[in-house]
Structure formats: C-alpha cells, structure tokens
C-alpha cells in the first residue's frame, strides 16, 4: 500500500481534494472567492515549474526545429480542431445536454486550447527512451505563446457560449503564465542559483504539484456550488460519460497521429516519441485557470490530465519494452 501511495500520491490527492471541494462546497464558498488567491497560486506554480527548466537543452533543437514545430502544430492546431468538431457532433447528437452539458462542452474546448504540460511530457518522453529536448522546446513554445493562442481558440470555438473578452484574457494569461516563467529563467542566469534549482528539481516538482492541488480544490468548490444549482439526472450522467470518452479518445488519437506522422516524415524513433507525448499532452494549471475564467466546468481539464497520466504510462512502458536498446532507456529514468 505504501509503495503504491508513493508512486501515485498525486492521483490519490487529486481525487481527495476534488471530492472534498465538491462535497463541502457551500461551507467553503468564501475560500474560493478570496480576491487574488487563484491568480497567486497559478503564478507561483508556473514560477516553480519553470525554475528547473534548462534553456540550454533547446539549442540543439533550434538547429533542427522540424520535430518541435510538428508537435506544436498538433498540440495547438490539430487537437483543438478535432475537439471542436467532436463537441459540435456531441451537441448535434444531443449527447451533451442541459446546463451541465453546456459547461462540460466549454470545459472540453478549454482543455484543447491549453498548452503542453510543463513537466510530464518530458518525464514520459525520457521514460520511453525519447528525446526530451524536443519536449522541453514544445513546452516553452506553447506556454510562452498560450497567452495569445489559447484565448483566440476559445473565442473561435466557444464564442457563443462564453462571455469572453480577448484583450483582458490575453493580458491576464501573459501576467499569470508568461511573466512567472520568464522571471524564473532570468534567475537561472545566475549559475549558482541555476545549479541549486536543477539539484532541487524533485522537491520543486512536489511543491508545484501541491500548488496544482490547491488550484483544483478551489475549482472543485466552484464546481460543487454550480452542480447544486443544476439538475443532473440521467442526462447529466450521460453527458459526463461522453466527456470522459472524448478526452481519453482524443488524447490517445493525437499521440498516435503525432507518433506515426513523425515516423512517416523520417524522424528518428526518439524524436517521434517526443513529438507523440508533447503533441498530445495538456497542462492542468493553465487549463484550470482558463476554465474558471470562461465559466466552464473544470472536470474536462482534470479528466484530460488524469487520463493522459494513465494512458501515457501504458504507452511509455510499451515503447520502452519495444525499444531496440532497452538498457539505454532504463538508465535515463524519471525525475
């Protein structure tokens, strides 16, 4: 039991805070409404996540940017388009019904518009024997540009369903996402600090995950209050089931599209693995922020994140077993 908790403590904690937030939402409503608390948590988490990132690892990728650009195009292009088409089909088929279905639809579109995750794409890439420099490059490109691209996608796909103003959202994401990451990288110019941040990567990762849990908790409180004002019934359960199927299917499909396209394009296996993971993964913290700001449900973003952790663990293990040199993949390990 203890080894399981050590390996899966984040997933267990995620389920716990989600249940507590939704279950005790009326009593905790004041906490979720504290001015600036959510924004402070988001900025802190992204600052901590960016501290261990080594910009130097991207230099080799810059000289051969094809793989990183392909992954970025899938993550910020094909995936949102596919999600948009899927949500429209579900709505036309009356499979996302009522107020809950509408909120889930917005949440799905938000999840698709968020950037690549800051940590797990590189972790799973290394675990599978891939080139994690590409994953880091995709992470930086998508997160630095998300303050413009993500609101534009949301404005295009969900404009009729959300009260979204482009300029305020761009400014807010720029301050909450890009600025903390930029400050963290500027601090790394001081080499002693950079070495300290690199050596403390596991501890910083745990700290950032705790911040994500705090953000999930606040989002769960808001979701719980919304659910209490909505009649769920069988239609709501059906909408929720279709949401789960959608996030799992699209994430898995995008991985294999990215991986196969890379292979057909002549990229090496390590590069193709990196494109697969970074082209299909989405970051939780930015998605939660956008979902709350857009008035959508946080459940699709959380479901996408949990789904990618579970699915990509299976994929990484399979790729690792099929690698031509499994011993080399073993030595790379996971942070």
Model-derived features: positions:
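Alpha-helical transmembrane segments of multi-pass small-molecule/ion transporters
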Residues: 1-335
């Amino acid at each position: 039991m203890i080894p399981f908790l050590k390996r899966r403590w984040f997933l267990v904690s995620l389920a716990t805070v989600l249940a507590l937030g939704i279950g005790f939402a009326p009593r905790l409503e004041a906490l979720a409404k504290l001015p600036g608390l959510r924004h402070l948590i988001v900025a802190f988490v992204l600052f901590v996540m960016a501290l261990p990132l080594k910009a130097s690892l991207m230099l080799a990728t810059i000289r051969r940017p094809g793989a990183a650009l392909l992954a970025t195009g899938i993550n910020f292009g094909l995936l949102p388009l596919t999600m948009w088409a899927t949500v429209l089909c579900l709505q036309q088929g009356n499979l996302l019904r009522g107020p809950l279905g509408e909120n889930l639809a917005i949440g799905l579109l938000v999840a698709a518009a968020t950037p690549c995750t800051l940590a797990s794409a590189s972790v799973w890439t290394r675990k599978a024997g891939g080139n994690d420099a590409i994953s880091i490059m995709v992470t930086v490109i998508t997160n630095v540009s998300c303050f413009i691209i993500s609101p534009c996608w949301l404005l295009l796909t969900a404009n009729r369903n959300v009260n979204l103003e482009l300029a305020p959202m761009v400014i807010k994401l720029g301050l909450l996402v890009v600025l903390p990451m930029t400050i963290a990288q500027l601090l790394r110019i001081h080499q002693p600090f950079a070495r300290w941040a690199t050596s403390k990567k596991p501890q910083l990762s745990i700290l950032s995950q705790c911040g994500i849990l705090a953000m999930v908790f606040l989002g769960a409180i808001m979701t719980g209050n919304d659910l209490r004002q909505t009649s769920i019934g069988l239609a709501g359960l059906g909408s929720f089931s279709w949401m789960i199927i959608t996030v799992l299917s699209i994430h898995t499909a995008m991985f294999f599209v990215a991986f196969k396209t890379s292979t057909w394009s002549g990229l090496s296996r390590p590069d193709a693995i990196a494109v697969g993971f970074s082209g299909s993964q989405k970051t939780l913290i930015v998605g939660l922020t956008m979902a709350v700001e857009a008035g959508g449900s946080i459940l699709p973003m959380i479901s996408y994140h949990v789904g990618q952790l579970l699915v990509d663990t299976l994929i990484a293990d399979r790729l690792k077993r099929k690698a031509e040199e499994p011993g080399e993949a073993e030595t790379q390990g996971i942070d």
